[in-house]
């Protein structure tokens, strides 16, 4: 019998074992679609970003007008730009749902996969931040100034670190140039870490909604989940295209239609919607260093999640108390997102402080406690 090239060719057999003949649990739900959706988001962002970079000029006097030129004069430049800007929002929607699914079903117990995933989230956040600075509008400039300035809270080396990052004594041309270089580089780093993420995942195999070992009931990835993933791509691209065609600026800030002016501060400096929860936590502490530490902790706390798992069951499928707590956490994050978009005044300050406190309380204390309690109730 002739050898199957799919299984014998050195390159094709890697693809085959990852995407075609991969043994997958038969009962994984649509919540397992988001990994592949993140992959397609990354590919879309790299392609649209590459096309935008061909028309972009990383110079403070030309950046804003080069983006305007792309939208007005380049063939379908407006569409490429709208897909890239809104594609970032969909990237974050997918990654937050992907993390939420991992949290709900106990996927974080695959520690290496989880940790590389958190590193991917941090890299994605860095990429989105430096990318937001590139159009050189008002919110781009002031966002860059405020967020990079946070590093000055680091004792002893802070101010030196900030000036080193800026390439001068304020956010200026060197800052924009290096941010463009970083924004071009980081997506390829994300692609590399994604391969490590998948390598670790394929070592253990996928988790499933029941959180039990599924070796006895595996099915091939293709055609079952490849088709399911294509359906997922379609269901994601439809709203993305609707947003890009009909209301491309819905998620943006109107302030960014004004070219950057170091002499005029916008009334409310705020990041894009996907950073608002962390921004609310940053603002809830009236001390600069404390706020920076809370901001870092709000994301880095994900590294601790595997160590805070106290339940004898992996998934939350049959743990009603943990489920209630999980949805409390989701509601809490939505409240933080809303607070981050509001001005710093009463009653938003106290609501933000309460929500920030609750966020850490749920993750660090209530989840392990409830896990222990459920063990006592069930066993």
Curated annotation (Swiss-Prot):
PANTHER family: CYTOCHROME B. InterPro entries: Cyt_b/b6_C, Cyt_b/b6_C_sf, Cyt_b/b6_N, Cytb/b6-like_sf, Cytochrome_b, Cytochrome_b_C_euk/bac, Cytochrome_b_N_euk/bac, Di-haem_cyt_TM. This is Cytochrome b. Heme b b562 binds at residues 84, 183. Component of the ubiquinol-cytochrome c reductase complex (complex III or cytochrome b-c1 complex) that is part of the mitochondrial respiratory chain. The b-c1 complex mediates electron transfer from ubiquinol to cytochrome c. Contributes to the generation of a proton gradient across the mitochondrial membrane that is then used for ATP synthesis. It comes from the Eukaryota. The chain crosses the membrane at residues 34-54, 78-99, 114-134, 179-199, 227-247, 289-309, 321-341, 348-368. Keywords: Electron transport, Heme, Iron, Membrane, Metal-binding, Mitochondrion, Mitochondrion inner membrane, Respiratory chain, Transmembrane, Transmembrane helix, Transport, Ubiquinone. It is a multi-pass membrane protein. SUPFAM superfamilies: a domain/subunit of cytochrome bc1 complex (Ubiquinol-cytochrome c reductase), Transmembrane di-heme cytochromes. The gene is MT-CYB. One of its GO terms (molecular function) is metal ion binding. Belongs to the cytochrome b family. It holds the Pfam family Cytochrome_B. GO terms for biological process: mitochondrial electron transport, ubiquinol to cytochrome c. GO terms for cellular component: mitochondrial inner membrane; respiratory chain complex III. Binds 2 heme b groups non-covalently. The keyword rRNA processing does not apply. Heme b b566 binds at residues 98, 197. Heme 1 (or BL or b562) is low-potential and absorbs at about 562 nm, and heme 2 (or BH or b566) is high-potential and absorbs at about 566 nm. A ubiquinone binds at residue 202.
């Amino acid at each position: 019998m002739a050898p199957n090239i799919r299984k014998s060719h050195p390159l094709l057999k890697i693809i085959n074992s990852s995407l075609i003949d991969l043994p997958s649990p038969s009962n994984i739900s649509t919540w397992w679609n988001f990994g592949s959706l993140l992959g397609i988001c990354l590919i879309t962002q790299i392609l649209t970003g590459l096309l935008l970079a061909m028309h972009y000029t990383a110079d403070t006097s030309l950046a804003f007008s080069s983006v305007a030129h792309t939208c007005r004069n380049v063939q379908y430049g407006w569409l490429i730009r709208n897909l890239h800007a809104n594609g970032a929002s969909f990237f974050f929607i997918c990654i937050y749902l992907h993390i939420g699914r991992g949290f709900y079903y106990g996927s974080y117990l695959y520690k290496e996969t989880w940790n590389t995933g958190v590193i991917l989230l941090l890299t994605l956040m860095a990429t989105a931040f430096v990318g937001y600075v590139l159009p050189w509008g008002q919110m781009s400039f002031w966002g860059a100034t405020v967020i990079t300035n946070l590093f000055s809270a680091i004792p002893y080396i802070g101010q030196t670190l900030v000036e080193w990052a800026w390439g001068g004594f304020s956010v200026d041309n060197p800052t924009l140039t290096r941010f463009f270089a970083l924004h071009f580089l980081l997506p390829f780093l994300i692609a590399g870490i994604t391969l490590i993420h998948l390598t670790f995942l394929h070592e253990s195999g996928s988790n499933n909604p029941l959180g039990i070992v599924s070796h006895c009931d595996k099915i091939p990835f293709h055609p079952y989940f490849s088709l399911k993933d294509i359906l997922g791509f379609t269901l994601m691209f439809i709203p993305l295209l609707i947003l890009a065609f009909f209301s491309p600026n819905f998620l943006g800030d109107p302030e960014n239609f004004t070219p950057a002016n170091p002499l005029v501060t916008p009334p409310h400096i705020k990041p894009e919607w996907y950073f608002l929860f962390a921004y609310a936590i940053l603002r809830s502490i009236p001390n600069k260093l404390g706020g920076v530490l809370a901001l870092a902790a709000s994301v880095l706390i994900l590294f601790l999640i595997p160590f805070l798992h106290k339940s004898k069951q992996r998934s939350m499928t049959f743990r009603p108390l943990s489920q209630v707590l999980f949805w409390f956490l989701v509601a809490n994050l939505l409240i933080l997102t809303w607070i981050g978009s509001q001005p710093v005044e009463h009653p938003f300050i106290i609501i933000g402080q309460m929500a920030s406190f609750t966020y850490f309380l749920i993750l660090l204390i209530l989840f392990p406690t409830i896990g222990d309690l459920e063990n006592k109730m069930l066993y």
